[in-house]
Amino acid sequence: MPFKSGFVNIIGKPNAGKSTLMNAIIGERLSIITPKAQTTRHRIVGILNGEGFQVVFSDTPGIIKDPAYRLQESMNRFIEGSFQDADVFLYLAEIGQKPRKEDIPEQLQDTTIPLILVISKIDTGNQAMLEEHVSGWKALLPQAEIIPVSATNRFNLDYLLNSILHHLPEAPAYFEEDALTDRNERFFVTEIIREKILLNYQKEIPYAVEVVVDEFKDEPQIAKISAIIFVARESQKGILIGHKGSALKKTSTEARTDIEKFLGKKVFLAIQVKVSKDWRDNEKQLRRFGYLS
């Protein structure tokens, strides 16, 4: 039986469930998940290997219609890149999202690349809502196969994977058989820390931070990690640290616990907070943080 391999790029609005879906299909927690929009900032690859196939999923940031910062413009460019190299598109629309043509990226409206429209989070809706959404999206994207799923309950995930495999081209594997992602451990450590910030802080703080791991010593029994949280303004630094350091201590403890699970060993985690004034609009800093090449 010929080997199948290809790139499956996941597109959708912020908070449509893209990261949850990729994590559920792959069976690993590669993308961080929070209730906040714009949780995913980078394009993250997750690799699923099976008998006779390799699927390379790409989780992208949510589409931002009117970017307010150069950071958000860079995030949109990651999405643009995903339109160029796909063998299959998954366009995610959660069941609460009314079918509207203006929400569909132009690149998908007339694409000749196989397109699967995934109606996500169907566990939060009902049968009448689902039928309404299926008919509405079918009218807007008649070329798309429509598959309703619940990643949380794993409903229809096997059916979705079989559909993806049907569309994949015959090709050799792009990555080693045991590969899970193209990202290194440092990247996932920064994402875990950022996830805790997104969960523990409100308003502007979660969107004004960037996390950098400046030291990573991976010893046999313990990983010694030093990280810096950059904020855009001095006032944000105080909020992030909290009274007598209480807020930062909580975030650090929660991050360390998850990093230990991720690495499978004890972790010593030291975190500093520094100000990088208006970094979201600073080209030099955006390059440093990996948002510009």
Give each language-model segment a name.
Residues 1-77, 81-83:
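Conserved G1/Walker A P-loop phosphate-binding module
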Residues 17, 156, 247:
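Conserved glycine(s) of the Walker
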Residues 28, 47-51, 63, 82, ...:
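Conserved, well-folded catalytic cores of nucleic-acid-processing
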Residues 40, 64-65, 98-99, 125-126, ...:
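Catalytic P-loop NTPase motifs of RecA-like helicase/translocase cores
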Residues 52, 76-144, 217-219:
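Conserved C-terminal guanine-recognition region of P-loop GTPase G domains, centered on the G4
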Residues 59, 120, 150:
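Active-site glycine-centered loops adjacent to acidic/histidine catalytic or metal-binding residues
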Residues 114, 123-181, 185:
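Canonical P-loop GTPase G-domain recognition
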Residues 185-293:
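P-loop NTP-binding site
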